């Protein structure tokens, strides 16, 4: 009995060695044998993709006398129709509109620390309460007009708050004071 256990273990180790050296054929895929084993690395970036030599460089945002307010703040101010469209998108997405205003600085600034951070200069005062249950974009625009009358020298922004995930999903400037 002991000799049969010993001989079967020896046979098993021999078959494992033989199986490690065998390569099973691929079915439905190309065999790796057709590809070269080593390839020369091409470090020339001109061979990656070409647009036919028609390169157009975009000018970057000039940092002098230009303030960054929010995402896409480099675009021109939104018109009333564009504001309505953004607010309708916010409402269709199921987010709660909320207005905030800032009387001193409506742009990103670093007050307490010199290293950059997402929330630097982003604490704004809430205008009234969030507009839970609001379904009409013109109601939100009416609140923007009220905020503009109450604080004509303030920045007013509209945020879309997802009350399920408890996060702010959209934010854009609705009004900037004269000269900004």
Swiss-Prot record:
Alphabetical list of CDD domains matching this protein: RuBisCO_small
InterPro entries: RuBisCO_ssu (IPR024681), RuBisCO_ssu_dom (IPR000894), RuBisCO_ssu_N (IPR024680), RuBisCO_ssu_sf (IPR036385)
Span of chain positions assigned to the transit peptide in the UniProt entry: 1-56
Top-level division of the source organism's lineage: Eukaryota
Main subcellular location of this protein, as a coarse class: plastid
Gene Ontology CC annotations of this record: chloroplast
Coiled-coil zones: none
GO molecular function: ribulose-bisphosphate carboxylase activity
Locations listed in the record: Plastid, Chloroplast
UniProt keyword Chloroplast, yes or no: yes
Record keywords: Calvin cycle, Carbon dioxide fixation, Chloroplast, Photorespiration, Photosynthesis, Plastid, Transit peptide
GO biological process: one example: photorespiration
Further remark: The basic functional RuBisCO is composed of a large chain homodimer in a 'head-to-tail' conformation. In form I RuBisCO this homodimer is arranged in a barrel-like tetramer with the small subunits forming a tetrameric 'cap' on each end of the 'barrel'.
Protein family membership: Belongs to the RuBisCO small chain family.
Quaternary structure note: Heterohexadecamer of 8 large and 8 small subunits.
Function per UniProt: RuBisCO catalyzes two reactions: the carboxylation of D-ribulose 1,5-bisphosphate, the primary event in carbon dioxide fixation, as well as the oxidative fragmentation of the pentose substrate. Both reactions occur simultaneously and in competition at the same active site. Although the small subunit is not catalytic it is essential for maximal activity.
Protein name: Ribulose bisphosphate carboxylase small subunit, chloroplastic
Organism the protein comes from: Nicotiana plumbaginifolia (Leadwort-leaved tobacco)
Taxonomic placement: Eukaryota, Viridiplantae, Streptophyta, Embryophyta, Tracheophyta
């Amino acid at each position: 009995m002991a000799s049969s256990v010993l001989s079967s273990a020896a046979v098993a180790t021999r078959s494992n060695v033989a199986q490690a050296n065998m390569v099973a054929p691929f079915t439905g895929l190309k065999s790796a044998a057709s590809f070269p084993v080593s390839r020369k690395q091409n470090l020339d970036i001109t061979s990656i993709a070409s647009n036919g030599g028609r390169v157009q460089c975009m000018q970057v945002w000039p940092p002098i006398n230009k303030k960054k307010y929010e995402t896409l703040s480099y675009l021109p101010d939104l018109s009333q129709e564009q504001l309505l469209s953004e607010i309708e998108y916010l409402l269709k997405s199921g987010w709660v509109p909320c207005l905030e205003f800032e009387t001193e600085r409506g742009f990103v600034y670093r007050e307490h620390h010199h290293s950059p951070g997402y929330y630097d200069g982003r604490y704004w005062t809430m205008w009234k309460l969030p507009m839970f249950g609001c379904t009409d974009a013109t109601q939100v625009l009416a609140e923007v007009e009220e905020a503009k009358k109450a604080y004509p020298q303030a920045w007013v922004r509209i945020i879309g708050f997802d009350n399920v995930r408890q996060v702010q999903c959209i934010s854009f400037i609705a009004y900037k004071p004269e000269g900004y």
